[in-house]
């Protein structure tokens, strides 16, 4: 499973680089993001990525992940990329304000433990995404 996720992350990095970004994949490290480099405008940037097999109207961002990213140097642009069956979403975390923390019963983040626990999360709406690229033939009813 982790190899598949890393392959998806690398594919996203490749696609972004085709659009003028200069990113390297960091998903195999213990850093709180999956890619780092510069935007097409030359600004320092990091991207955290999530790949969802099921479509949900809101996109979950764990408060701990958000805090780890937003507390990086202020000259770094922080992005959250979500891919689901409907579309690909890019959230610019630097501009999100007044996020409302919620507690949800979610799966543990470890692959070795199938248990669930309460997590503090932000629920991001699709309207908050900076860029949305619809997936063709998306089936959101699954």
Task: For the regions a language model picked out, list residue spans one by one.
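Acidic-basic catalytic patches of nuclease active cores, encompassing PD-(D/E)XK
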Residues: 1-27
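Short amphipathic alpha-helical segments and helix-helix/interface helices
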Residues: 13, 66-70
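Conserved catalytic cores of phosphodiester-cleaving nucleases, focusing on short active-site segments
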Residues: 35-37, 41-55
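Active-site-adjacent loop/helix micro-motif of nuclease/hydrolase catalytic cores
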Residues: 53-64
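Nucleic-acid nuclease catalytic cores
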Residues: 70-98
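A structural signal for short, well-ordered beta-strand segments and their strand-loop junctions
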Residues: 25, 46, 79-83
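Intrinsically disordered, low-complexity terminal regions enriched in charged/polar residues
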Residues: 90-142
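Beta-rich catalytic cores
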Residues: 31
